[in-house]
Amino acid sequence: VFLSITKLKQVSILSLLGISTLYYSQQKSNSEQVNEENLKKHIYYLASDELQGRLTGSEGETKAANYLSAEFKKLGLKLYEGKEFIQNFEYNVKLNPHDDKTSTTVKGKNVIAVLDNKAEKTIVIGAHYDHLGLNEHHNSTLANSQGQIHNGADDNASGTAAVLELARLFSQNKTKENVNYIFALFSGEEDGLMGSKKLAETIKTNYPNTIFMINMDMVGRLNKDNNLTVGGVGTSPILPDLVKKYKPESINLSLDESGVGPSDHTSFYLKDIPVLFLFTGTHTDYHKPTDDAEKINYPGQKTITNYVFNLANALGNEKEIPFTKTKVAATKSVPKYKVSLGIMPNYADTKDGMGIDGVIDNRPAANAGILQGDILTKIGTCEVKEVYSYMDCLAKVNSGEEHPVTVKRNGEEKVFTVKF
């Protein structure tokens, strides 16, 4: 879940009407407030044991989809297509990652609603609502956790709740915005962005003038330093200044240019739609049964959701949002690797190493003495500058090999021997 930044210039010549519109938009943004109790209610239900971890294709996913559909219906939103808020899709997944014969067909459900302002342009605000279920698809970071409920409060009941609350704000205010909003809740993300791929395939047919996509994935664990990663800022020249302009005073931003990352904005970027991706970072509960609702930073999530509300308003008032291909996406593909270091990477592109946000117990990094907060700079002789070069370096390592791994700790270089 992530992503760096280019500097930009923004030139705007505002007519009197334009100034009035901008002023009103800012006034509206300040008066409309996210309801923290709504966020909490949605997350506690979606991340409850009743939903059994919301695995795509499961009964828990169906319960979640019905809940989300009911919320959209209460708001009086329109259908995206067909006769219900649900968009069905299918894909194959291997139940045993080492055996092709275990492949099975999974039927997933996106939940999509439209605020139709009869506008020429459309913005998508989305998040995935699926999670790992009982670890049937082997995506957990906890060994031997099959059968344990992975509730996925941060990943991604948090983003889902934010989309629901934004749908409420935009549909219940007394303003007819300059754009239509599509509120999209995806399933199949944990198996490879399957649901967002389905919507991205049809979006330009149903809404040809879709100009932007905002994705929220894991926005519920704002840390004590108030660090928020915003990816995709290189996908349009207007974005670096815009995300800074509306930044809440308490938030520290890490900006990343790339339109590609391990979350649903990628599907839209690949259709030449500019994107933003918001992410509060990985943590030791990531993809574990312990990612529970009581661990969410609800005031922090409220701040982030208000931030997205302001960004979505501002983007709707832009006359044009040009699309830019980002350098990393043009030159990088996701490599295949045979080993894991057992860390949680920081996806901010710092160019001088990759920060380690978490270290998983009893995995190679932890066993070697690498700590959370270290900055990874080398695996063997392969230099690590950010998450993409980290993946390249990891792809060169074979299981059973030992390599020196270099990190910076409190400004001092340290080398550890890691057995992969």
Explain the meaning of each model-derived region.
Residues 392-420:
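PDZ-domain C-terminal substructure recognizer with occasional recognition of PDZ-binding tails
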Residues 328-372:
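PDZ/PDZ-like groove recognition
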Residues 284-330:
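His/Asp/Glu-rich mid-to-C-terminal helical/loop segments that flank catalytic regions of hydrolases
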Residues 118-120, 186-277, 297:
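Metal-dependent peptidase/peptidase-like ectodomains
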Residues 54-115:
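A non-catalytic alpha/beta surface segment that caps or lines the substrate-entry region
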Residues 33-63, 75-81, 95, 212, ...:
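N-terminal capping segment at the start of a domain
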